[in-house]
């Protein structure tokens, strides 16, 4: 498998090296790093080239790195059924930077891009229907961002008396607690009975 991935990485670099910033193989998958300006050209090449044949888009997701200047990674997962290979395309974008929509290349990318917009707030330029897909109407914020509060901003519940859904500010019934998960069986400073032989 890694030989096929090495061959694919070398082929893509040779054929379209200007579109690829770097290529790595980790955990049995090839990752091609690119830029927002080059992502559509790279996706089109990977789909249309006879040697590649990545005709299926499996997923598009985001990764939030709030400490970085380019806060988000946008990650595309592609599949080539003919070669039985997967490839990951990754690019970095700032919080206020858009990514060209990949829907002209892969029709199946539409809902994946809507999900990345809904969860992270990553805008996909040229997407024809970029609206929330998982959260409720009027939802504020993007819940998979690292700076989004764990409790959220509002609590949604159904009221049996009023026979409708109510949106109320979050009211915590107890303070946040900090649990100490250290095991009493790990990290001891003293030698346990029977272990003194192992140290010799």
From Swiss-Prot:
Organism expressing this protein natively: Agrobacterium fabrum (strain C58 / ATCC 33970)
Positions of transmembrane segments: none
Reactions accelerated catalytically: a quinone + NADH + 5 H(+)(in) = a quinol + NAD(+) + 4 H(+)(out)
Compartments (UniProt record): Cell inner membrane
InterPro entries: NADH_DH_suC, NADH_quin_OxRdtase_su_C/D-like, NADH_UbQ_OxRdtase_30kDa_su, NADH_UbQ_OxRdtase_CS
SUPFAM superfamilies per the UniProt record, alphabetical: Nqo5-like (SSF143243)
Function: NDH-1 shuttles electrons from NADH, via FMN and iron-sulfur (Fe-S) centers, to quinones in the respiratory chain. The immediate electron acceptor for the enzyme in this species is believed to be ubiquinone. Couples the redox reaction to proton translocation (for every two electrons transferred, four hydrogen ions are translocated across the cytoplasmic membrane), and thus conserves the redox energy in a proton gradient.
Keywords: Cell inner membrane, Cell membrane, Membrane, NAD, Quinone, Translocase, Transport, Ubiquinone
Family membership noted in the UniProt record: Belongs to the complex I 30 kDa subunit family.
Top enzyme category: translocase
PROSITE patterns: COMPLEX1_30K
Gene designation per UniProt: nuoC
Membrane topology: Peripheral membrane protein
One GO MF term: NADH dehydrogenase (ubiquinone) activity
Lineage start: Bacteria, Pseudomonadati, Pseudomonadota, Alphaproteobacteria, Hyphomicrobiales
Signal peptide annotation: none
Protein name as catalogued: NADH-quinone oxidoreductase subunit C
GO cellular component term of the entry, any: plasma membrane
């Amino acid at each position: 498998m890694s030989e096929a991935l090495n061959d694919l990485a070398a082929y893509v670099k040779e054929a379209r090296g200007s579109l690829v910033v770097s290529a790595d193989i980790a955990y049995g998958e090839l990752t091609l790093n690119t830029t927002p300006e080059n992502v559509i050209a790279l996706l089109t090449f990977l789909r249309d080239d006879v040697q590649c044949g990545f005709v299926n888009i499996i997923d598009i997701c985001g990764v939030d790195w709030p400490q970085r200047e380019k806060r988000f990674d946008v990650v595309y997962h592609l599949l080539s059924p003919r070669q039985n290979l997967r490839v990951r395309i990754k690019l970095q974008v700032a919080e206020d930077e858009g990514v060209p929509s990949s829907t002209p290349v892969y029709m199946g990318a539409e809902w994946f891009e809507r999900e990345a917009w809904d969860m992270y707030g990553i805008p996909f330029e040229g997407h024809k229907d970029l609206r929330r897909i998982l959260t409720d109407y009027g939802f504020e914020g993007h819940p998979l961002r690292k700076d989004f509060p764990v409790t959220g901003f509002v609590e949604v519940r159904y009221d049996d008396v009023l026979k409708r859904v109510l949106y109320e500010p979050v009211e915590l019934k107890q303070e946040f607690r900090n649990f100490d998960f250290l095991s009493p069986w790990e990290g001891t400073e003293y030698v346990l009975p029977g272990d003194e032989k192992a140290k010799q």
